[in-house]
Amino acid sequence: MWTSKTISFTLFITTTLLGSCNASAKAKTQPLFPAILIFGDSTVDTGNNNYPSQTIFRAKHVPYGIDLPNHSPNGRFSNGKIFSDIIATKLNIKQFVPPFLQPNLTDQEIVTGVCFASAGAGYDDQTSLTTQAIRVSEQPNMFKSYIARLKSIVGDKKAMKIINNALVVVSAGPNDFILNYYEVPSWRRMYPSISDYQDFVLSRLNNFVKELYSLGCRKILVGGLPPMGCLPIQMTAQFRNVLRFCLEQENRDSVLYNQKLQKLLPQTQASLTGSKILYSDVYDPMMEMLQNPSKYGFKETTRGCCGTGFLETSFMCNAYSSMCQNRSEFLFFDSIHPSEATYNYIGNVLDTKIRGWLKA
């Protein structure tokens, strides 16, 4: 028979357990950063290129976005989510990161962060002049407008606290090589050594990080280069490469650049009081998937899912292009950009690294 003491004790235990469960659930869903701020190129551009009229690098047409919830293209260069969205989701910040140039952004979207990246952009201004993208060096101007809007919503003090604690993602660099240095003879004459050009690009990157710091950014994730020689479009560029193997020299270029970047970032952090700068390795995860595709569910790694997969990207990947049905089995969606499945794996690797970085 239940006594009043038994009932009271049972209620106490139940309430305690429920409270503990709720606290645990809340801890798991709490965002690790108050906001996410993203700068760079098409690997992280969530749609800013929908708005400048002069650029040809757009993804606001099918089949881009075919695996998004509404199956609708919105400027992301993949079949679904890209790295920006995936890392924001994993860190419990938001499901999708909106582009800053999107009209009618809500206050909540501003407070939790936006994307300033532009497809076709590079650290080298010459790269963006060729592609008509929003130059990386211009993206802080959008950021300044964002800061003004954020301050109008939450006030100056809270706005700077959000920016100081936001995760800032910087992802650019490949365009400087595949759309510029490798393709423009005059640029190679100015920088006869690839190492010299890498140093120039890295100096631009370093100045960019310092500018973000001057605007209040403190926690900055900086991406390295992927294995550029394994991008389908680069393999296609070598007409004799009938067997479609990775271009080892371009991969060596990526490795050298990444080694220099990993040496540079700790020096930059040491010069910027209170900063935490993390190198984001995309080369090794990509090579792991390329070398062990079946382990990750991939069956095709040398061409994209869109069209022939050898050359199509941006406007060449369109409604008239043939489309693979098994998109999760393709490492690349078009001839340059990874599929959502690939971004997911890279996101998992970096999520683990970021969480460890926060504890350090």
Curated annotation (Swiss-Prot):
Nucleotide-binding in keyword set: no
E.C. code: 3.1.1.-
GO biological process, one term: lipid catabolic process
Protein's organism: Arabidopsis thaliana
Cellular-component GO terms for this entry: extracellular region
Residues of the active site: 42, 334, 337
Keywords: Glycoprotein, Hydrolase, Lipid degradation, Lipid metabolism, Secreted, Signal
Localisation: Secreted
Gene3D superfamilies: SGNH hydrolase
Name assigned to this protein: GDSL esterase/lipase At1g58430
Protein family according to the UniProt entry: Belongs to the 'GDSL' lipolytic enzyme family.
First and last residue of the signal peptide: 1-23
Glycosylated residues (UniProt): 22, 104, 326
